[in-house]
Regions:
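Active-site nucleophile loop of the alpha/beta-hydrolase fold
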Residues: 76-77, 136-144, 167
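Conserved alpha/beta-hydrolase "acid-adjacent" motif
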Residues: 171-177
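Hydrolases whose catalytic domains are alpha/beta-hydrolase-1, hotdog thioesterase
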Residues: 121-125, 145
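Short beta-strand/loop motif that positions the catalytic acidic residue
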Residues: 158-159, 164-166, 170, 188
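Gly/Ala-rich beta-loop-alpha elbow adjacent to hydrolase catalytic centers
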Residues: 114-122
Length: 224
């Protein structure tokens, strides 16, 4: 159970509740979108260049609760503190460890997830924290233009069922660049690192987002 002294609850609206959790990296913030009859918690964090308002995280928070999945959008301490730059990976991992008791408090299996840098954190810490599975959105396989600096080992080492959702034109790693491994991969056609698609594409932005939510809904439904 999370220490009551470490957590503050503030209800923002009927559909969302915000929770401040003290971690060894500083205060983190969880925005809960709770399912009425939840069977899973999906915790998702942001990347190094944006927040939980990202289109994929917002869409999942809107779509999944109706299907029995509570969504927890997590803001790392550096974002809560208003800093411009993300800290080192070990500090991101420290913040994620610190919020885990609050995520596990409902007593449900927790799927650890995130986009970009948040996906790396989820992969690195999944086994240690006892995550039920990992959702990796826009996994940054390598820095743009530097495929030799691969982060595949983090993905391959998650140790739990893992779904990667990747834009077809992601400069941090296109779907065809990913190595074979014990994970599932769904491509968002023409999507960039933020899953934005060009206007000339044969898929609309709304359809691209639907690829993400449909894939995650099907995958979470398959988890035992």
């Amino acid at each position: 159970m999370t220490d009551a002294n470490d957590v503050a609850h503030v209800t923002n609206a009927a559909e969302a509740t915000t929770e401040i959790v003290e971690t060894d990296a500083g205060p983190a913030r969880i925005t809960w979108h709770t399912a009425e009859k939840a069977r899973l918690v999906l915790a998702v964090s942001h990347g190094a260049g944006g927040g939980i308002e990202a289109r994929d995280l917002t869409a999942l928070a809107a779509a999944l609760p109706a299907h029995g999945v509570s969504v927890a959008r997590v803001e790392q301490p550096w974002r809560v503190a208003g800093k411009k730059l993300a800290p080192a990976p070990k500090t991101l991992d420290l913040g994620w460890r610190g919020i885990w008791p609050a995520l596990a408090e409902p007593g449900l299996p927790v799927v650890s997830g995130g986009r970009s840098a948040g996906a790396r954190v989820a992969c690195r810490t999944a086994t240690e924290l006892g995550a039920h599975a990992v959702l990796a959105l826009s996994f940054p396989l390598h820095p743009p233009g530097k495929p030799e600096k691969s982060r595949a080992a983090e993905l391959l080492g998650s140790g739990v069922p893992t779904l990667v959702v990747q834009g077809g034109n992601d400069p941090f790693g296109k779907p065809g660049e990913f190595p074979e491994g014990p994970y599932e991969l769904v491509e968002v056609p023409h999507g960039d690192h933020g899953f934005a698609v060009p206007k000339r594409a044969e898929i609309t932005q709304e359809e691209a987002v639907a690829v993400i939510t449909d894939a995650v809904l099907e995958w979470t439904g398959s988890l035992g």
